[in-house]
Amino acid sequence: MFLIRTINIDPRGCHDIDDVVSLWEEGGVWTLAISIADVAAFAALNPALLFAEKIGQTLYTSGGKALRPMFPLKFSEDIFSLLPGEERFAVSLFAKWDGTILYDIQWKECIVRNWASYTYENCKDCSEINMDVLYKIVTSLGEETGDTHKWVEYLMLFYNSEAAAVLKRAGAGLLRIHGEPEKELLARLESLSLPANELAYPAAVYATTDTVGGHWGLRKDAYCHASSPIRRYADVLNQEVLKAVLRGGQGTHVSYKHYALALNRLDKSAKAYERDCRFVDCILGAPGAPVHGIVVELLNGKTSIYCYDWKRMIRCKTGATLTMGDQVLIGFYVNMTTASWKNRIVYHVERV
């Protein structure tokens, strides 16, 4: 794929480039290729890299900087990364485009060269590939939008969905399972005009391929993580399966149930870290300034309140008599004498 024009679209300043996109016309037929950095090839040759399974995924600061990379920076931002002008191993999905749908899906192990790097802000000026055709393709995968973040998202969802189908047939790897939301809570949040999609949905989890269920939020019968192996260890495991299938095998003989349990624990911790970072940013951004909220639930002596400014739920004891739907004003201060930082934030709630 040296002569095929290929680009990446990522946030400004991104160095750990997982994915690149190619698009070309030959004989009147358009072909799309989505190529993902072949991290599994290096992990297989260097057992020391398997330490990444203890980390699970890269953690980022609120500004997008890698705070704790899953792999050493020399690997994640250099050896693995699909940097412009460099030749790299990749696991690629190829699909033909007939103007309406993508068809003739094929998987290949490739060597790719990234021709140019673009950001979400300037990628529409790309001259290496036909962006008008790419726009039509991503619209067929999702919905019509000028948001280039969504363009990349739709392409990765397509890659991951097709990868999940391969894993299911092979009976190996890790799927991403997402159950239906709690209907009672969903109805309550909708009645209060709150973001039900964010607050009522259960967290998606990793599971083995024999697990019943799909991804409710994405409306997929089967879905997996395979497009970010530099940043997530589940993607490395699934990439190993894809490569084994391409070579005529059925995947590696490992305990995927063990990996599912371990990665779910790490995933939960990572989400808590991201959530807490956003929360602390809010607290530090306006220390002591009261914020507005609405009462969502009263249970076991505690009140669940959605804070509009913080875009999150808090649970706390309140002295006031409140009912669901009450608008409240939340004051807070920090008590540094307690061990847990969450308990250091003391709330005072008043009905508006």
Q: In which residue ranges do the predicted regions lie?
A:
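Electropositive polyanion-binding surfaces
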Residues: M1-V352
